[in-house]
């Protein structure tokens, strides 16, 4: 269920922005990029007719529709969009307190499951060496493409960390994952732990 508040002042501001686009039926689309991770960002974009996804949730507002990416809905729970006018014009604010919170279930997308394991199980251990690992992308054949950073980039022990730590943990927790691949440039050893 959609639990997002768009205040009257935000609706007025957004409606005025949309009217300037001179596009009949234009709305907004709200989504979270990198949901459930520390890098999560809540975004609002124009949504021209035909750009909404079939699975999007729709909120009918005064003068326009707001579309919400289905995958982002759990991360937008209790989100609030507000507009506060000031001397310089005003500011649109988006508060999404659950955007960085992992919300994983059996039917969650595999990318969310990978990010959950990386940020909650793997990275806390790597942080003791000043390192981290993140998901770059998931290939069509189910391979997780990972990038190491911090003390892990260029570290001589990264192969062992990848195979015996990261890959083993991910494969145990996410059986549908085909494997992992590291795309980090390890020739840069400036921050390497070992």
UniProtKB/Swiss-Prot annotation:
GO terms for molecular function: 4 iron, 4 sulfur cluster binding; iron ion binding. Its cofactor is [4Fe-4S] cluster. This is Fe/S biogenesis protein NfuA. The gene is nfuA. [4Fe-4S] cluster binds at residues 152, 155. One of its GO terms (biological process) is iron-sulfur cluster assembly. Involved in iron-sulfur cluster biogenesis. Binds a 4Fe-4S cluster, can transfer this cluster to apoproteins, and thereby intervenes in the maturation of Fe/S proteins. Could also act as a scaffold/chaperone for damaged Fe/S proteins. Binds 1 [4Fe-4S] cluster per subunit. The cluster is presumably bound at the interface of two monomers. NCBIfam families: YhgI_GntY.
